Amino acid sequence: MNMGGSSSTAAKKATCKISMLWNWYTIDTCFIARSWRNDTKGKFAGSCIGCFALVVVAQWLTRFSRQFDVELLKRQKIKHLASYSPEEYVVKCGEEDAKSDIEELQGFYNEPSWKTTLISLQKSFIYSFYVWGPRRLNEPEDDLLKKVLSCCTLITPVDLYPTFLDHMIRVTIFVLQWGLSYIIMLLFMYYNGYIIISCLIGAIVGRFIFCYEPLGSLGANGSAQGTVSYDKESDDRKCCL
């Protein structure tokens, strides 16, 4: 009888405390899986911190995805422009200035596609962490792209598509965003006040850090810049896409 009572008590203690109504449970709460069980206040505090970090990472991933598209498009534009004859560029921009620029354009044209992808990933990772001050470094390719676009007026319109590697990376990033959004949605469905507040604070912090971006660009060549100049609602990877 004592052994049976001990087993019954142990089973009762191991029960997950779940409610479909708003609650402030801390001990014996379970989230997503039975293995994610908080039997101490320390574990529950760790779960709150983890939920906070999860939402912050989701916000960073959203910014990184947009920035990767911007960096990739900028380098693809330069590589496409480098395939044109330099005659018009020399006439309109001057032979002295054009000589070094043409050599640089040739370097972009000969750049392997995998290297273009890696450089775009590197720059996206760096720029996604910019919070204060100038949004971008003063890089040669930014000035080069604006100069070439202002001098080359006879460019045939063309659609620039990502390479297979670029597309696979973009798909992978999207799947991560999509998966994180549903995990966060499931955490909200436990209606635990502490977890929901932790997620909301994570959204505030993540949005504040990673989404401080220009509202737009002013100037004739503003559209040629590689900065992120939009923050559309459709660009956020929220749940239930």
From Swiss-Prot:
GO molecular function per UniProt: copper ion transmembrane transporter activity
InterPro entries, A to Z: Cop_transporter
Record field: transmembrane: 42-62, 160-180, 183-203
GO cellular component, as recorded: cytoplasmic vesicle membrane; endoplasmic reticulum; plasma membrane
Lumenal topological domain: 1-41, 181-182
Pfam families assigned: Ctr
Entry's localization field: Cytoplasmic vesicle membrane
Keyword annotations from UniProtKB, A to Z: Copper, Copper transport, Cytoplasmic vesicle, Ion transport, Membrane, Transmembrane, Transmembrane helix, Transport
GO terms classed as biological process: copper ion import
Topological type in the membrane: Multi-pass membrane protein
Induction (UniProt): By copper deprivation and repressed by copper excess.
Superkingdom classification of source: Eukaryota
Main location: membrane
Segments on the Cytoplasmic side according to the record's topology features: 63-159, 204-241
Family matches, as PANTHER family: COPPER TRANSPORT PROTEIN CTR3, SOLUTE CARRIER FAMILY 31 COPPER TRANSPORTERS
Similarity comment: Belongs to the copper transporter (Ctr) (TC 1.A.56) family. SLC31A subfamily.
Function text: Required for high affinity copper (probably reduced Cu I) transport into the cell.
Protein's name in the database: Copper transport protein CTR3
Organism: Saccharomyces cerevisiae (strain ATCC 204508 / S288c)
